[in-house]
Each structure stands twice: as C-alpha cells, then as structure tokens.
Swiss-Prot record:
Presence of the UniProt keyword Zinc in the record: yes
Name of the protein in its database record: U1 small nuclear ribonucleoprotein C
Family label: Belongs to the U1 small nuclear ribonucleoprotein C family.
GO MF, any single term: zinc ion binding
Compositional bias (Pro residues): 73-96
This protein's record includes keyword Zinc-finger: yes
Zinc fingers classed as Matrin-type: ranges: 4-36
UniProt gene name: snRNP-U1-C
Cellular compartment(s): Nucleus
CC annotations in GO: commitment complex; U1 snRNP; U2-type prespliceosome
Region (Disordered), start-end ranges: 64-96
Length: 146
C-alpha cells in the first residue's frame, strides 16, 4: 500500500487514506510546519526583491525615487496659470464652496441625548439579485402580454 509523504513535515504517514491525511493536516505540528514554511518563503521573496532593487539601482536603471517629489517626478506646470494658496482660517471668498454644516460636538453636559444609530450598509441595499443575473441589466419579462 502506498504511503503519503508530507512535504511540510518531511515525514511519511502510516498509509494513504483521507481520514489519516485529514487528521495529520489538522494537527498542531503540521500547521506550525506549514506556517514556518510560508514565513520562510515570504522572507526569501522579500530578500530577492531587495536584492533586485539594489542591483537595478547600482546599474543605473532606477534614476530617481518616484515618491521623492523632485522636479523630474512632478508634472510640468502650465504657463500663465496660477492657483492661489488656500486661505487658512480666513472666511471663504464669495462663490467658493464652504465647509459643509457640522453638528456641534457633544459635551458631557448633554447627557439626555443619545448618539444617532449606525445604519448597516447591507440593510440599505436590499436583497441580493438572483444568481446568474448581470448587474445593471434588467431581466426579460416572462409572463408579459402576447
């Protein structure tokens, strides 16, 4: 009878049957070995990425950090167009949208008031569409006039 070999645990099971494999795979040692295997694999992938990035930088393939915000990464400014800085703390100019109305902050003196209930987003959506339907497409009318 063939034996089942577990690559993570580096061991043979007594025999190849679903119940033995299930028992083995739910065991603590097997789960720890699987976790260790993938942690090691992720560390190797991260190190490979670091090495490849370092080699590309040394070879001159990476010339500038795209997140640095230097002059080469910024889009060119159109000539003649100037956007004034925002007014910090000043009232908005006429025609500019202001801040939306914000309710006053609750303080400990407002003990008789309760916060508004939080709506469940799923409750506002309604029931899900039947399986096999395409979102946004109306289903055909089955019992319509003939």
């Amino acid at each position: 009878m063939p034996k089942y070999y577990c690559d993570y645990c580096d061991t043979y099971l007594t025999h190849d049957s679903p119940s033995v494999r299930k028992t083995h795979c739910t065991g603590r040692k097997h789960r720890d070995n699987v976790k260790f295997y993938y942690q090691k694999w992720m560390e190797e992938q991260a190190q490979h990425l670091i090495d490849a990035t370092t080699a590309a930088f040394k070879a001159g393939k990476i010339t500038n950090n795209p997140f640095a915000g230097g002059p080469s990464s910024a889009p060119p400014k159109p000539s003649g167009v100037s956007i004034p800085p925002p007014n910090m703390g000043a009232p908005p100019r006429p025609g500019m949208p202001g801040m939306p109305f914000m309710p006053p902050m609750m303080n400990p003196m407002m003990t008789g008031m309760r916060p508004p209930p939080i709506m469940n987003p799923m409750a506002m959506m309604g029931p899900p569409p039947p399986l096999g339907t395409i979102p946004g497409v109306r289903p055909p009318i089955m019992n319509g006039p003939k």
